[in-house]
């Protein structure tokens, strides 16, 4: 009975609403004044390639590539490290850049990088960025003894956030030099923290043609002030040490992470080529943060789950019927591969209105 109840619970996590992008009703977004926060002067990287003999896939040559970051990215050796799934097929192919959830879960990026490569059968090149080091070391920040150490720790974390965004832009520089990559069809996908990073990259780099943001948001200071679990542990520990209330904490991160807010780059996104996946009961990304990202990106296509922050990831598993994975793949097929807009999507048809499954 316990197993049956568990399967029923997990299977229920496939319920969601799929909303189409409506260009007729979308409002024109004013172009923001853009500070050059994510600018850089480093040349296009020339990565070292290394073999991955036990990670090969049919239709691909899978190898590793790495090069020094031009910033301080907090990753091992201060390197940019990625797995490159290069198609064996002739001709220029699109590139999908898959972002990690730094120093946290590898499951979502593993499913998308390996799964989409196999799904397309060699019609897309895939670059899976690695992320073994944290951007925000929650436990280290939680243990700061005083305000000076707190400022230093947050400054370093925000610097790493900016650094990995620049690392991604330099991966795009590299992609433009590759004869097998069609650099007019570059997509990016991020999850949670990397959805936030990815949205800042897309808002600053017009070479990003297609973007998927899974369980991300804007207004990162609200996330810092309201997210649960390890972020809440850090917040409570620091607040006790510094004798701050929640609003002081929120105000501090509003200043420190002002350039990490995707809403700054409104008017720079391509809403017709953007997919947002969110949870209406997300206990890490507040409602105002979710709404701000949706509005800043031009009210694009959106999938909404009625769950918390982690439950939609269950829809990327066989128990959850891979519903979320299939929706993401179908969107990428349409945008990167030019599949027909009216292609049937499993058990539902995406229309100009809303479709609920």
Labelled PLM ranges:
Residues 81-82, 92-101:
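Short beta-strand element of the alpha/beta-hydrolase
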Residues 111-114, 272, 285-295:
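Short alpha-helix in the alpha/beta-hydrolase fold that links the catalytic acid
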Residues 103-165:
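Cap/lid segment of the alpha/beta-hydrolase catalytic domain
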Residues 269-270, 275-278, 282:
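Short beta-strand/loop motif that positions the catalytic acidic residue
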Residues 43-90:
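N-terminal cap/lid segment of alpha/beta-hydrolase-fold proteins
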């Amino acid at each position: 009975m316990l197993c049956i109840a568990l399967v029923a619970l997990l299977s229920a996590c496939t319920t969601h609403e799929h909303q189409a992008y409506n260009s007729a009703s979308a409002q024109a977004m004013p172009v923001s004044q853009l500070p050059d926060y994510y600018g850089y002067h480093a040349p296009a990287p020339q990565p070292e390639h290394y073999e991955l003999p036990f990670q090969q896939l049919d239709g691909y040559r899978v190898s590793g590539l790495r090069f020094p970051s031009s910033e301080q990215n907090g990753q091992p050796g201060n390197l940019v490290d990625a797995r490159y799934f290069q198609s064996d097929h002739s001709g220029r192919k699109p590139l999908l850049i898959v972002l990690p959830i730094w120093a946290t879960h590898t499951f979502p990026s593993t499913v998308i990088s390996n799964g989409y490569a196999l799904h397309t059968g060699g019609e897309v090149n895939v670059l899976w960025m690695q992320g073994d080091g944290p951007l925000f070391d929650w436990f280290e920040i939680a243990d700061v003894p005083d305000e000076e150490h707190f400022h230093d720790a947050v400054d370093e974390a925000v610097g790493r956030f900016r650094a990995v965004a620049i690392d991604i832009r330099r991966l795009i520089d590299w992609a433009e030099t590759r004869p097998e990559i069609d650099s007019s069809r570059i997509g990016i996908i991020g999850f949670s923290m990397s959805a936030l990073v990815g949205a800042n990259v897309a808002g600053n780099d017009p070479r990003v043609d297609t973007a998927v943001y899974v369980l991300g948001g804007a207004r990162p200071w609200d996330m810092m002030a309201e997210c649960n679990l390890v972020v809440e542990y850090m917040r409570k520990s620091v607040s006790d040490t510094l004798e701050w209330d929640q609003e002081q904490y929120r105000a501090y991160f509003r200043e420190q992470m002002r350039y990490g807010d995707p809403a700054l780059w409104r008017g720079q996104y391509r809403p017709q080529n953007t997919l947002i996946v969110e949870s209406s009961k997300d206990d890490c990304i507040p409602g105002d943060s979710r709404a701000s990202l949706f509005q800043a990106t031009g009210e694009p296509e959106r999938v909404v789950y009625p769950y918390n922050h982690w439950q939609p990831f269950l829809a990327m598993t066989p128990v959850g019927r891979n519903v979320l994975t299939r929706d993401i793949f179908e969107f990428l097929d349409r945008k990167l591969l030019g599949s027909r807009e009216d292609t049937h999507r499993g058990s539902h048809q995406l229309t100009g209105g809303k479709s609920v499954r």
